[in-house]
Amino acid sequence: MAGVRSLRCSRGCAGGCECGDKGKCSDSSLLGKRLSEDSSRHQLLQKWASMWSSMSEDASVADMERAQLEEEAAAAEERPLVFLCSGCRRPLGDSLSWVASQEDTNCILLRCVSCNVSVDKEQKLSKREKENGCVLETLCCAGCSLNLGYVYRCTPKNLDYKRDLFCLSVEAIESYVLGSSEKQIVSEDKELFNLESRVEIEKSLTQMEDVLKALQMKLWEAESKLSFATCKS
């Protein structure tokens, strides 16, 4: 019949196939197509899973680094300051006894100081502005006698918060964060080169160079004698 295409199975049967494989031709082609599509989907899913895993790992690493930086910053903030004499570097006190800082007088107030701070028992009246009636005792470094500031012994009512506090001049002290030093003892096998060791190494290299030159000269003489003997024979 015109316009009608004869359908045949794998055995050559026509559309009205009576063999047992009826419909298996089309089923096998559909199955292959579905398997191909499933394979493509599986590959795509694997690709997405790989990308998601990579992104998750990167995010996890970034979170860990951020947390580590935050911990280090918090630890740095919690480390106390140690105040040193600017003349001899003796420790005078630390920020654990910190009370306040005064920008107008350029000093800091501490509740207590170390034994390196000497107190002059001779009392005198303060000559600073807004400190009328304050009785002071001079503070000096026990090591180098540098004037460090004052301790308030008597104060008017409006300055009672300064009484028995140690006022250290910022110009007379230095400070560093406790635990901030990164210097470590270097073992003998990792000791850094200094000037003396460099001189010794250069001396040894010069001696080795002289020995090599002497050996080269002897080798040249031996080759010359051998060449002369060969020519003579």
From Swiss-Prot:
Glycyl lysine isopeptide (Lys-Gly) (interchain with G-Cter in SUMO2) cross-link site: K162
Short name of any one Pfam family annotated for the protein: Yippee-Mis18
Residues recorded as bearing Phosphoserine in the entry: S36, S39, S40, S233
Gene Ontology MF terms in the entry: identical protein binding; metal ion binding; protein-macromolecule adaptor activity
Organism superkingdom: Eukaryota
Disulfide bonds: none
Mis18 domain: residues covered: 80-178
UniProt entry keywords in alphabetical sequence: Cell cycle, Cell division, Centromere, Chromosome, Isopeptide bond, Metal-binding, Mitosis, Nucleus, Phosphoprotein, Ubl conjugation, Zinc
This protein's GO CC annotations: CENP-A recruiting complex; chromatin; chromosome, centromeric region; cytosol; nucleoplasm; nucleus
InterPro entries, per database record: Mis18 (IPR034752), Yippee/Mis18/Cereblon (IPR004910)
Known outcome of mutating C85A: Abolishes location at the centromere
Family: Belongs to the mis18 family.
Protein name: Protein Mis18-alpha
Source organism per UniProt: Homo sapiens
Biological classification of the source: Eukaryota, Metazoa, Chordata, Craniata, Vertebrata
Gene name linked to the record: MIS18A
